[in-house]
Amino acid sequence: MKWLLLLGLLALSECIVHKVPLVRKKSLRKNLIEKGLLQDYLKTHTPNLATKYFPKETFASVSTESLENYLDAEYFGTISIGTPPQEFTVIFDTGSSNLWVPSTYCSSLACFLHKRFNPDDSSTFQATSETLSITYGTGSMTGILGYDTVKVGNIEDTNQIFGLSKTEPGITFLVAPFDGILGLAYPSISASDATPVFDNMWNEGLVSEDLFSVYLSSNGEKGSMVMFGGIDSSYYTGSLNWVPVSHEGYWQITMDSITINGETIACADSCQAVVDTGTSLLAGPTSAISKIQSYIGASKNLLGENIISCSAIDSLPDIVFTINNVQYPLPASAYILKEDDDCLSGFDGMNLDTSYGELWILGDVFIRQYFTVFDRANNQVGLAAAA
């Protein structure tokens, strides 16, 4: 009997899911609107999702990443770096691969308005001579790379490389609700070839399975979760459907089609899609998105937002994304976002033709509806209806 109990405890210990709560806060866009700064901001900082993906096909620098594209991000988690630990609020971003935070090396105003990592206060920090540069808008975040203990939930990684910012020009981060970014994509797109956090977790034997999963709650600030090393079936209904990763860089998959009332409105001959927790909206080619906006009756306001009548939500159809022969319907309650007295379309246009064809981004609008597993061991994405 004792042996059976011991074996049971061992089996349980091998499948521990390390959960990190995410909090839903006001996005950078909302903060700018409340301060009356959005119009001025958009004059000099144009969000363009195309700059985040496949930079080598779009720009000269391999480390280009448009930080304006976090304008609508709403889900954030807490990590700590150093000994004793220094806490930071970060975006857990499956659309990038680097971890970086502001540091005391940085004298930009944006850094002073956020938590800054002080390497002098950490007994375990190890400096390097390597640099990091992430270009965005009219300037760039520059910094250095160092090693230290990074704690994510109850996972303590004692040898994680990360970026310490030295400059953060512009106003992008002045009212940003987060300090830094923790990338969860593949190492092949990591700037300066820095080992991503999850890769290090797996390499160091800190997680029992080479996968992580994400649940984004639709209700209230709390309840969202990123889970490392396992899957908690209480966060979804039915069974997981698995989709092969079509290219190992981003979490990129092949999508069969997009339909409304049985009519194909986009992606007629299949297309590529990136599942990205760091993108709030659902994005695709401008021409296709314009067609969808017209279909649902959305029109732009003075701030460039796509507004729709809130009274129309109940009469709007599902938009169906077919992936690996499985249909994933998005009801209007999912793709129409209520903002105080306004209702906004959850779709955004971008133009980026890659060597893989047209690209779509399945951001938080999609992930809120479908619990998502990012399986590195088998290079696949699992999807199931969120509980």
Curated annotation (Swiss-Prot):
The keyword Ribosomal protein does not apply. The modification Phosphoserine is found at S129. InterPro entries: Aspartic_peptidase_A1, Aspartic_peptidase_AS, Aspartic_peptidase_N, Pepsin_A, PEPTIDASE_A1, Peptidase_aspartic_dom_sf. GO terms for cellular component: extracellular region. Its main location: secreted. Keywords: Aspartyl protease, Digestion, Disulfide bond, Hydrolase, Phosphoprotein, Protease, Secreted, Signal, Zymogen. One of its GO terms (molecular function) is aspartic-type endopeptidase activity. It holds the Pfam family A1_Propeptide. CDD domains: pepsin_A. PANTHER family: BETA-SITE APP-CLEAVING ENZYME, ISOFORM A-RELATED (PTHR47966), PEPSIN A-3-RELATED (PTHR47966:SF22). It catalyses: Preferential cleavage: hydrophobic, preferably aromatic, residues in P1 and P1' positions. Cleaves 1-Phe-|-Val-2, 4-Gln-|-His-5, 13-Glu-|-Ala-14, 14-Ala-|-Leu-15, 15-Leu-|-Tyr-16, 16-Tyr-|-Leu-17, 23-Gly-|-Phe-24, 24-Phe-|-Phe-25 and 25-Phe-|-Tyr-26 bonds in the B chain of insulin. Residues 16-59 form a propeptide. It comes from Oryctolagus cuniculus (Rabbit). The keyword Phosphoprotein applies. Disulfide bonds join C106-C111, C267-C271, C310-C343. This is Pepsin II-1. Residues 75-384 form the Peptidase A1 domain. One of its GO terms (biological process) is proteolysis. The active site is at D93, D276. Shows particularly broad specificity; although bonds involving phenylalanine and leucine are preferred, many others are also cleaved to some extent. Belongs to the peptidase A1 family. It is found in: Secreted. Residues 1-15 form the signal peptide. It comes from the Eukaryota. Its EC number is 3.4.23.1.
